[in-house]
Design a protein with these regions (language model features):
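Amphipathic, small/basic residue-rich leader segments at the start of a protein or domain
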Residues: 1-101, 119-126
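N-terminal glycine-rich flavin-associated loop
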Residues: 98-120, 145-147
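A short, Trp-centered hydrophobic/proline-enriched beta-strand micro-motif
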Residues: 131-146
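A short core secondary-structure module
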Residues: 173-215
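A structural signal for short hydrophobic beta-strand segments in well-ordered beta-sheet cores
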Residues: 161-164
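Buried hydrophobic positions in well-ordered alpha/beta secondary-structure cores of metabolic enzymes
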Residues: 12, 23, 86, 116, ...
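Hydrophobic, small-residue-rich alpha-helical packing segments that form membrane-like cores
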Residues: 144-146, 152-155, 170
C-alpha cells in the first residue's frame, strides 16, 4: 500500500484518500459480511451491484472516460501512476474488484485514444451513466496471450481468431479464454486477424463487440 505522499499531486492524494476510505468503510465490511457469496454459482452474486454503485459514486469507475462524457478528470501526465495507485488501494480490500475496475479503465482509454468520434459518442455516455456497465479486453487465446505483442512480428505469432468482411458486416470466428470481466461485461474489445500473414502489428484489428451480438 502506498503510504508516502512523496511525488504525489494534490489531486492524487485526494483520490488515494477517497479510495482508502471507500475500502475501509465499504468494501472490507461488505466482504466480511458477505463472504459466502464468493462460492455462489448464481451469476447475480459474482459482483454485487452495491459495490459498483459506490465505486461509481466516488468517481473511480469512470477514470478513463473523457470528462465531456461524464467521466472523472485525471491529469494525463500522471494518469498511469494514478491508475496504479488506485488499483493498489482497492486491492487492499478486494483484488477481484480492483481487476474489474482496471479492465474498465483499460478499455475506456483505448476508446478515448483510438476509437472514432461516433463510437465514443455512442458508448461513453452509456459507460458513464450505468454503474453496472463493465468492459472487457479480449486478447488471450488457448495458444497464447500478451506475449504476441513482443517484437517478433512473424505470421506464426498471429491471432487464431479471424475476422472477415462479408458484405457490410464483419464476421469473427475464434476462441478467447481467461478474459477478465468476460462473464459480466456489456462491451468487449476483441482482437482478431484481418490480414493473414502480415504479422501482428499490421494484420490485427480490434473490434467493439456488444454483449448481445448474435453468435
Amino acid at each position: 500500500m502506498l503510504t508516502s505522499d512523496r511525488g504525489l499531486s494534490e489531486e492524487q492524494r485526494m483520490m488515494r484518500d477517497t479510495c482508502r476510505a471507500f475500502v475501509n468503510d465499504f468494501v472490507t465490511p461488505f466482504i466480511r459480511n458477505n463472504w459466502q457469496r464468493e462460492w455462489s454459482m448464481d451469476p447475480k452474486d459474482r459482483l454485487p451491484r452495491e459495490i459498483l454503485e459506490q465505486a461509481h459514486k466516488i468517481g473511480i469507475r469512470t477514470l478513463g472516460v473523457p470528462e465531456e462524457f461524464g467521466g472523472t478528470p485525471v491529469d494525463p501526465k500522471t494518469e498511469v501512476q494514478t491508475f496504479a495507485m488506485i488499483s493498489e488501494e482497492i486491492s487492499r480490500g478486494d483484488a477481484g474488484l480492483s481487476d474489474k475496475l482496471v479492465q474498465i479503465w483499460k478499455v475506456s482509454v483505448l476508446l478515448r485514444n483510438i476509437a472514432p468520434r461516433h463510437l465514443q459518442e455512442l458508448w461513453f455516455p452509456r459507460i458513464a451513466q450505468d454503474p453496472s456497465f463493465l468492459l472487457s479486453h479480449c486478447l488471450t487465446e488457448p495458444r497464447g496471450a500478451s506475449d504476441r505483442w513482443l517484437p517478433y512480428d512473424v505470421p506464426e505469432a498471429m491471432m487464431h481468431t479471424k475476422a472477415e468482411l462479408k458484405g457490410d458486416k464483419w464476421v469473427i470466428n475464434g476462441r478467447k479464454q481467461f478474459i477478465s470481466n468476460g462473464y459480466d461485461a456489456k462491451l468487449y474489445v476483441v482482437y482478431a486477424t484481418t490480414k493473414p500473414g502480415a504479422g501482428m502489428t499490421k494484420g490485427t484489428s480490434s473490434f467493439l463487440v456488444p454483449r448481445d451480438t448474435p453468435g
